[in-house]
Amino acid sequence: MGAGQSTTTTEGRSSPEEMSHLLAQRFASKCFTPLELTHLEDNFNSQALDEHGLRYWNEEILSRFLGIPDGAGEKASPQTDATLDAGPVLFRMVSYLGAFPFHNTLAPSVLTYDAIVKVIVLLTERYGRVLKRGRKDRMKLLFGSLADVGRTQTEKQRETSQVDTKMSSDEAYSTDGASSNITGFSIDAPANDGEEEDDDDDLALAALESLDAIEVFKHDQRLDRSVYKARISVSTFRRLLALLLVIAPLHPMGRRQMIQTDAESIDAVQPSWIASCSLGDEANGDGHYLSDFSRVITTSLPFLFDPLTPLFEHFLFSKNLDLSKRKDSHQSHEESNSPSPPPSPHLECVFLPGHFETNILNSAILSHLSFFLSTSYPIPNLFRNQTRLHPVFSSDFHGESLTAFSHHVLTWHAPSLLLLKGVTGSSSSKQETVLAGAYLPEPWKRSTSPLSTPMSDFLDTSRFPCLFQLLPTHTVLQAAPAFKSLKSNMPVVSFSTNSGIAVGCMIPPSSRTSLNNELQPRPSGGGSLIIDPALENATFYVSDGLHGDGVFLPPGLSPSSSLSLSASATSSTMSISIHSIEVWGVVPTPAELDANLDPNSPKDAISMQKAMWDFEAREAERRKTIHLNVGGGDSEAQTGRALLEMAGIIGDSQYSPRRR
């Protein structure tokens, strides 16, 4: 292993091992408080193995400490759920990251104290305190820690005699003692393929510059990839997604035991991610290469790795040093040994109480949404920023009526989340479940009212709308940078009793000839969603977006990316037979409300909605006193009252829950 290599060099300069130790010391002194280091040292030393004076952790200890499912491998049973067998994947990651920045020489590293310090700093993004020039983006580093290496079929036939000369990283670590013929992960093997070098090594370069050891780094990083093609296999990616889905709601002080996520929900979500990432067929050995991995994560799942931060911050809290346990010296031994950190939030902590129970959202879907939706600034992740969801409208409870929709949704003056679930409308092929929606940062308005958010909020991604599809494939259409400066006939969302609900569409201007027959919205830009007035059918459009401007960018593009990135090559139209529509209000966090200096912004959307409903109720009562006996007869009065009821001015029958 890398740890067993010589610590001297023929040229007399510092070896990678020495520089790695020095970097770990600098990380420890600059990136942690003394109290955090005390807890970290206690956690490590209390469970470390000792072999010839070398203290380290193995995969079993790491999985047990973090509460990671680790039921496959040698201990697998017929009842084992291999989907949640994330222990080997996580151990491979930390073994690679522990060798930072000398992955070619030292990886896979033994999980010593120095290695764990570097892993925590990298996965919690604390390195900015030391590496001022280092990139915030860890994409290449994370890819390297997850990548498997495969050969083409031609290479396998030509080099069958040399297949066993390279040990896998897991086999290398499982052998006793150090091995002198291991040079690191195969992802870093030299090969001279003539490809254009990827100079996305700012993080590693910054680390070595801080130690004045660039020459050591250059000696270690002679990379080439013609023989070995680095990729993340379908199996590895599948287990990674399952792990991230489960730990998404985890808080740093939460219990490390895995949240009981519905396995069926995970199985339903994962295939859409696999399809969107173009991982290919697992049986044929296809995998996910760096370019695709970087594109998909950047544009479609920008917060995918956020759950790793609170997971590894558990190292900074030791229950053995919990001072709260010493307040009562008379506590029983059982009570003193009980874990003190509070549990991580479940769905009931995210959802506010309301009139209906969701038929769309579950733990896996909510975790899925947290990987790309930005609901606050500067902390975008909805689990980290304490965002709460308030039930606003449900077609299952309030009825499939635009009148009921407008009564509940148009009175909500805060960001909202529109979700619809149904099946594909094509009868010629097998129907598939469809789950689509949109994040709308502005309150709903009738027709085409202009947006009120100023253009100065460009860095605040929570002010940008987002159109997405979660099933049967994962597709995210982010807002165009100039969506707020589009013409008034191209609003983010349009609501009309004649044309229905339109998201990201161009609304034709009204004219005398169309007063009684309003023109239908037209798709524009990279994608649009149109729901008919009956709330029974919808159409989801995705296009290359190059034919005209629009609210949303094509798939594969983000507001900060250049147009040279690969976007969707073809246009597609999906007809959806709607089963359920839900609208959830996004309640701002307390910190966001305190920092909000806009006097016109709603301080409490729930109270404002209730006040508007109370006003409508008073107006309805007042209209009941209108003298309807215009013709002097009871029949005319009954006719007038019936007209008012049909118009929705009096009476509440149109808002009553639909009976099923």
UniProtKB/Swiss-Prot annotation:
Localization (cell): Cytoplasm
All residue ranges annotated as the TLDc domain in the record: 359-587
A GO-annotated cellular component: cytoplasm
InterPro entries: TLDc_dom
Pfam families cross-referenced by the UniProt entry: TLD
Signal peptide (from-to): none
Main localization of the protein described in the UniProt heading: cytoplasm
Sorted UniProt keywords: Cytoplasm
ATP-binding as UniProt keyword: no
Stretches the record annotates as Disordered: 153-199
Record carries keyword tRNA-binding: no
Sequence similarity: Belongs to the RTC5 family.
Main function: May be involved in a process influencing telomere capping.
Identification of the protein by name: Restriction of telomere capping protein 5
Source lineage: Eukaryota, Fungi, Dikarya, Ascomycota, Pezizomycotina
